[in-house]
Regions:
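Short hydrophobic alpha-helices and adjacent helix-cap/hinge residues
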Residues: 1-265
Length: 265
């Protein structure tokens, strides 16, 4: 199960256009060109580069283009979430009029860095639960954006995996423990696994170097299927790990697997 890539790109394009209707001039430096910061927790490759381009396209369609009447400052943490606070602070020093945070960790870093600059987030699992907004209908504060309610979707994905492979009773959840949603995702999925009569082993990975040990652990635990939690680092990680470490005992390509994003397949 996954979101359609084209629709997701079209949505980010529309979001960029909507952001462009905000009164940039009032928040920009007096007499200067407004600066928009884009804060990424992922690397500038694949779907993330596509979505960044879609955001720029939306701005362009609304009449704002880089170098003419808008400056775009982009920062990529390349999966190293501990770099995000410094990157957010750097954007603030650039006097950005707005920060677009395309993942939960980047939105968390932006939120911690400022209470005044508007922050627009996307692909946030549960912005209310993690304290980004007061409610979905009345966000309050300086953050707004969209949610895909991933914390609620997760148990349904596990149920679908169970229906697709009913013989698999021991499953692995690959999750990034540094993601702000990690605890709530783990608890919800453990509860769902219990209701389904499944064993769900939580396996952590937050860096490239964690991936092979994670899959080795999944093999040692005799897991029969894999669920990948939604996370900017993990989105391309299983695929790249398969390419680089085909001799790993547990290979994602040989196990049934599910994720919210097709990019892990």
């Amino acid at each position: 199960m996954h979101f359609d890539r084209l629709r997701r790109r079209e949505f980010i394009t529309l979001l960029g256009g909507a952001v462009a209707t905000w009164p940039f001039a009032a928040r920009a430096q007096s007499g200067g060109v407004p600066v928009v910061g884009i804060l990424h927790s992922a690397s500038p490759t694949g779907v993330w580069l596509t979505l960044s381009g879609a955001f720029r396209q939306g701005l362009s369609q609304a009449g704002y283009s880089q170098g003419r009447n808008l400056t775009i400052e982009e920062r990529w943490a390349e999966g190293q979430y501990d770099r995000l606070p410094a990157m957010a602070a750097d954007l603030i020093r650039r006097d950005v009029a707005l920060i677009a945070a395309l993942t939960t960790p980047s939105a968390q870093a932006a939120k911690s860095a400022t209470t005044k600059i508007p922050i627009v987030f996307t692909t946030i699992a549960d912005p209310v639960q993690i304290g980004f907004v007061s409610s979905l209908s009345r966000p309050g504060g300086n953050l707004t954006g969209v949610t895909y309610l991933g914390v609620e979707v997760g148990p349904k994905l596990l149920e679908l995996l169970h229906e697709a492979v009913p013989s698999a009773k021991i499953m692995a959840l690959l999750i990034n423990p540094t993601n702000p949603n990690a605890d709530s995702q783990s608890k919800n999925l453990q509860a769902a696994a219990g209701r389904l009569g499944l064993q769900l082993h939580i396996i952590n990975a937050s860096t490239e170097g964690d991936l092979v040990p994670a899959f080795v652990k999944a093999h040692e635990l005799q897991t029969q299927a894999l669920m990948v939690a939604f996370d900017a680092f993990l989105t391309p990680a299983p695929r790249s790990s398969r390419r680089s470490h085909s001799d790993t005992p547990f290979r994602p390509s040989t196990r049934p697997a599910i994720s919210l994003r097709r990019e892990v397949s």
